[in-house]
Amino acid sequence: MVRVGLQISATLENIDKLETSHPDYPFFVKLTCSNCGEQSDKWHDITESERVQQDTRNTAGFNFFMKCKMCSRENSIDIVEKSNVPYTADDSGKLKTIVIFDCRGLEPVDFSPRSGWKVFSSENGQSFEDVDLSEDDWVEYDQKNNNSVGVYEFVSKFIKLKK
């Protein structure tokens, strides 16, 4: 079992908080089999609120289950409960772990942010739902505070964590 953290960094303009629509946010990732090294070509979604039952060893199921096409090993990933945290104005421009994955036989290697993010403007301004970060930048106008808000230079990476 390996714990892998998803870290993000972005420049926030007039934004207090950026977060996923947890627990229903689908994390789109590309994966590598830890056993044989086979890397998936397609994006897989992992959602904390969804459980799949594929294994008799774990009656609670998993957030994601996949059998490797190359070595046939059965692998799973769970999102660690209460690990999903917001990215705040204080974090702007710095890498921060926003969610932790409990990986068994698989490791995420690439992340696609897509839509489903929530943005909260500074000074009790407007909040925006279902924000799409697939272009790594997002800009909108906060009518409550009469200023522009934006997420710029969005980047992500995965890091292995100690237990």
From Swiss-Prot:
Pfam families: CXXC_Zn-b_euk. Keywords: Metal-binding, Zinc. GO terms for molecular function: zinc ion binding. Disulfide bonds: none annotated. InterPro entries: CXXC_Zn-binding_euk. The keyword Glycoprotein does not apply. Zn(2+) binds at residues 33, 36, 68, 71. Belongs to the UPF0587 family. Requires a bound zinc ion for normal folding and solubility. This is UPF0587 protein GA18326. It comes from Drosophila pseudoobscura pseudoobscura (Fruit fly).
